């Protein structure tokens, strides 16, 4: 099983599937289609049925029930795209038999995965790790999840003695830019419950997510030759800087944890005439979330009072909501996942997602979908890695969930 997981993850990782928030297509990038078509062929090869890809790149497949009992149809999902935070081109995964200490990812560039900066690394002594080469992200988020689902389905097909109901599988595009389920056909997927395999370290089990919004704030100034600019030039960049300075410094991602929400300035672009600032807003509490959006709007109003109505324009949209509200009424699905982990001597770590998953949106579309660990660490950057042993445990958790649904029906 470990060899299958290694081969699958490395193969998937080498396909550049970074999404693009500026694209209007679904999937947002051609590379996602490349992986989707590859996975379609692989699903057929391992023996899955009802394999379909729609015009938007949503790949679905079925493992038919092998039981005559009335077992709820469950689903497992992972996303094919990787994050835009760091380059995902020419990913060159490395396999490390880790014996402790620091890992030199790239000797030439002096990129070191250190136990000082990442103390959790020490706990992986004796594990086989898949790392980056220090120049790209790895893409274990969420290609480790794809590998785990694929390997679990292959195992169940090869072991028909394991009783299970109908299992649906889906691989989806554009999760990293918040559009994952936007065109997902829940009725076509036709599962009663589902799980995303999109978490991090061993034991993560999550059914709470952020409420999330994104804001694009455009500042308009007046560009004049600097030699004759007195009393004429209005520098949009300076107005943007004044706006940014209004946000509480301690309410940023680098200063928050647990249930603490934040404002996150993700990018700035512009010149004297026009500057664009992009924020994301996050909070687990719905009321606090709405208050944060109101605060941003108030800061914009303050700018208008000082510089005029046309000096600033805010476009803000909600991206997803906390899935807890939709999962708590069917919390048995969380308990089943927890039991599956405990049967493998895994201690479930039930904590809120400081982010979102496709399950955040799917839960509001009528498909309650908690999130399960992949075994990965340090997603979205050059220090990303995943434990092969913990990938195997994630795979066995998927198998265990399928077995428990059958046993409890």
Swiss-Prot record:
Q: Which molecular-function annotations from GO does this UniProt entry contain? A: metallopeptidase activity; tripeptide aminopeptidase activity; zinc ion binding
Give the EC number(s) under which this enzyme is classified: 3.4.11.4
Which PROSITE patterns does its entry note? Answer: ARGE_DAPE_CPG2_1 (PS00758), ARGE_DAPE_CPG2_2 (PS00759)
Q: Gene3D superfamilies this protein is in?
A: 3.30.70.360, Zn peptidases
Which residues are annotated as active site? Answer: 81, 175 (proton acceptor)
Write out the annotated subcellular location.
Cytoplasm
Query: So what does this thing catalyse?
Result: Release of the N-terminal residue from a tripeptide
Q: Which InterPro entries match?
A: ArgE/DapE_CS (IPR001261), Bact_exopeptidase_dim_dom (IPR036264), Peptidase_M20 (IPR002933), Peptidase_M20_dimer (IPR011650), Peptidase_M20B (IPR010161)
Keyword Metal-binding present in the record's keywords: the answer is yes
Q: Which UniProt keywords apply?
A: Aminopeptidase, Cytoplasm, Hydrolase, Metal-binding, Metalloprotease, Protease, Zinc
The yes or no answer to whether the keyword Transcription regulation is present is no
Q: How is the cofactor bound?
A: Binds 2 Zn(2+) ions per subunit.
Residues involved in Zn(2+) 1 binding: 79, 141, 198
Q: Which cofactor is essential here?
A: Zn(2+)
Coarse class of the primary localization is cytoplasm
Q: What does this protein do?
A: Cleaves the N-terminal amino acid of tripeptides.
Instruction: Report the family membership.
Output: Belongs to the peptidase M20B family.
Recorded hits in PANTHER family, A to Z, give:
PEPTIDASE T
Q: Would you tell me the protein name for this molecule?
A: Peptidase T
Which gene name does the record give?
Answer: pepT
């Amino acid at each position: 099983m470990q060899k299958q997981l290694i081969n699958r993850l490395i193969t998937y990782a080498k396909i550049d599937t970074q999404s693009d928030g500026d694209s209007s297509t679904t999937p947002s990038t051609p590379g996602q289609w490349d992986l989707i078509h590859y996975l379609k062929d692989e699903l057929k090869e391992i023996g899955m049925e009802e394999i379909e890809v729609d015009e938007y790149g949503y790949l679905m497949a079925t493992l038919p029930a092998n039981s005559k009992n009335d077992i709820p149809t469950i689903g497992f999902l992972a996303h094919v795209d990787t994050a835009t935070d760091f380059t995902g081109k020419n990913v060159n995964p490395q396999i490390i038999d880790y014996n402790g200490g620091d890992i030199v990812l790239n000797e030439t560039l002096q990129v070191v995965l250190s136990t000082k900066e990442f103390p959790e690394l020490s706990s992986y002594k004796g594990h086989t790790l898949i790392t980056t080469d220090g120049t790209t992200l790895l893409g274990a988020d969420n290609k480790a999840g794809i590998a785990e689902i694929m390997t679990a389905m292959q195992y169940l097909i090869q072991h028909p003695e394991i009783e299970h109901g109908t299992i649906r599988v889906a691989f989806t595009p554009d999760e990293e830019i918040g559009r994952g389920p936007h065109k997902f056909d829940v009725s076509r997927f036709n599962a009663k419950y589902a799980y995303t395999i999109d978490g991090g370290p061993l034991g993560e089990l999550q059914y709470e997510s952020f409420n999330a919004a994104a804001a694009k704030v455009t500042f308009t100034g007046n560009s004049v030759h600097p030699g004759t600019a007195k009393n004429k030039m209005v520098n949009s960049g300076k107005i943007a800087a004044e706006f940014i300075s209004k946000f509480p410094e301690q309410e940023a991602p680098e200063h928050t944890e647990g249930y603490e929400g934040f404002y996150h300035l993700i990018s700035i672009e512009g010149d004297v005439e026009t500057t664009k600032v992009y924020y994301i807003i996050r909070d687990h509490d719905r009321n606090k979330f709405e208050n944060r959006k109101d605060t941003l709007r108030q800061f914009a109003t303050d700018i208008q009072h000082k510089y005029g109505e046309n000096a600033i324009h805010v476009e803000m949209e909600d991206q997803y909501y906390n899935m807890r509200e939709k999962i708590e009424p069917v919390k048995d699905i969380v308990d089943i996942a927890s039991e599956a982990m405990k049967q493998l001597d895994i201690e479930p770590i039930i904590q809120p997602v400081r982010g979102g998953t496709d399950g955040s949106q799917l839960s509001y579309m009528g498909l309650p979908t908690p999130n399960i660990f992949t075994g990965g660490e340090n997603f979205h950057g050059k220090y990303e890695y995943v434990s092969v042993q913990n990938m195997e445990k994630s795979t066995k958790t998927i198998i265990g969930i399928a077995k428990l649904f059958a046993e409890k029906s």
